[in-house]
Amino acid sequence: MMARAAKSKPLRDVAELTKAQAKVELMRLALELEGHDKRYYQDDAPTVTDAEYDALRQRFNAIEKRFPEFVSAESPSQKVGAAPSGRFRKVRHAVPMLSLDNAFAEEDVRDFVGRIVRFLKLDDDKIDFSAEPKIDGLSMSLRYEGGELVTAATRGDGAEGEDVTANIRTLEDVPQKLKGRNVPDICEVRGEVYMTKKAFLALNERQKAAGDTIFANPRNSAAGSLRQKDPTITASRPLGFFAYAWGEMSAMPEETQTGMIHWFERCGFKTNPLTRLCHSVEELIAFHQRIEEERAELDYDIDGVVYKVDRIDWQERLGFVSRTPRWGIAHKFPAEQAMTVLRDIEIQVGRTGSFTPVGKLEPVGVGGVIVQNVTLHNEDYIKGIGNKGEVLREGRDIRIGDTVVIQRAGDVIPQVVDVVLDKRPKTAKEFHFPKTCPCPLHTDVTREETAAGEEGSRARCTGEFACPYQKIEHLKLFVSRRAFDIDGLGEKQLQYFFDEGFVKEPADIFTLEKRNAKLKLEEIEGYGATSVRNLFAAIESRRRIALERFVYALGMRHVGETTALALARGYGSWEAFHDACLKVAKGDEEAMADMDALDQIGDTVIKSIADYFGESHNRGIVERLTKEVEIVDAEKPKSNSAVAGKTVVFTGSLEKMTRDEAKATAERLGAKVSGSVSKKTDLVVAGPGAGSKLAEANKHGVKVLTEDEWLKLIGE
């Protein structure tokens, strides 16, 4: 919800952020990223450039690195893409389609290689990597059974995509039947659907002549062409496909990444001819520099270079961290900049009440995307002060009317990197934060204190559920794709229902049909009987929901998708989770210890849950909601291993694998890895130097294994 305000203050560097400021900014950035993910992955209509988006993720990751205790699932580091749009049948990926972490400087690449060397406990950095241009297109997974194409699905949110099989069959680059020998019975080939620059220009000429929509860039045109209900439209569009990865495979035909690339070619796929095998960090960086120099001459858009560990067995050992693999990284190209005029500054009130100043720009093209909004972070940032009190932009403040330099290096909404003082008009106005919330209630504004007890730069509305801006943001999260995923209740419809008083809390959505005799929604302009019936049907179809989605939909601070999933798997059922939450809210030490023992759950999340369920208003909302829906128990780990579903603790020194590798292996086999021992712990793997955790295991009678016994148990 946007509202105009007056003057304002600037933003701080990550190194200067206090814990309180970091917590607030992480939540704000997470919400921004969610909106941009939806516009990019679902709507094929991004409002920011890739560089701007990357900058946002950079800042978010930097804050999380400095404050690891604040890592939550709402962080961009915990998410992949966006949930399927609902226009196509949903397809669950047998192997998740995760995204790569980003590198923006040579030092990032060196750190990436160093982490791999340490993880694998290698004596040197002599590792082979495949290197290839990062195509700016639409990720696709093609499933073949018995050599025949059976399903084509988009990335979606990484776990679930959209079925676009009929459309994919129209692409010449996608074989209907795989060629060659040693083709596995089940084979998922992954790659990128793209459109060449030449084809993009020709398509836009035809669109313009026909009076149809003009696409912003080749990526949007490729995505829009593929996600057509009518396959003949897709067939008329010149789309290409590069194969570069795989998902579920009943057998691996090759032992290396580059070997798989050649195997794809033998099967009938096109692969990027610029792919190379590199043997050192220096070769990786040299390849990046060469591709950047050749970038303008290529007939397709790229936004960086991808590096992957070549040995597949090493990829499997390295595994994943949340949403990204340890064995791969995308080395992005430098950001692009442009100058434009800052026309106004508006205050955005987030779901948690935090104020974010958003600059409204004279529209300007940056890297092929029209940019109209820019995040100004907080008061200090606007004043030219960084997070640690350092000077930004040589002390130049930002005023309404200024000519500013914006950069699309990664901020979801681009960032202002400078102000052109020579162009500052006499009418330029300083911006000051409002003293009250811009909502109709004009509730008071509070400031989060710094670690030194001083007033911070982050402003927050104190109205909480009384503030209509916060209420509506909670409802938007509730109906979002990652939560209840209710079709027909978009932002505009939900805002209308909220303004009219039809929906004030989540349970109201499920009682709309009962109340419609009085509300008469079909008489509202733009609705009609058919639209209302469809809406009620969509709502009815969402009365049954998975536990992890329900927990996420509650909108508790610091409980995003990843955390919600960890809680759901930890407790199994709503009854068990709800009971634990009520006990935690009352300060029950045993309940808090049990929750703390869950993977990815720490003090910050526990406090947030305690605060939420300690508030009677929230308990009432939950009670009314649970009367309207059925909450499905969490799925059990899909693994036949001896440790599936067990809670494991590693302690002491491990000699045959790193601690990270041991944790990744256990989780891959369906186990839960905890950092502390409790009576609910199933196994403790103890190496030399094991101390208090081993003592706790003996105290609780928990089974203790040596490293060799652990490896034998898991069959490695």
Swiss-Prot record:
CDD domains: BRCT_DNA_ligase_like (cd17748), LIGANc (cd00114). Its cofactor is Mg(2+); Mn(2+). Its EC number is 6.5.1.2. One of its GO terms (molecular function) is DNA ligase (NAD+) activity. Keywords: DNA damage, DNA repair, DNA replication, Ligase, Magnesium, Manganese, Metal-binding, NAD, Zinc. Pfam families: BRCT, DNA_ligase_aden, DNA_ligase_OB, HHH_2. NCBIfam families: dnlj (TIGR00575), PRK07956.1 (NF005932). This is DNA ligase. It comes from Bradyrhizobium diazoefficiens (strain JCM 10833 / BCRC 13528 / IAM 13628 / NBRC 14792 / USDA 110). The gene is ligA.
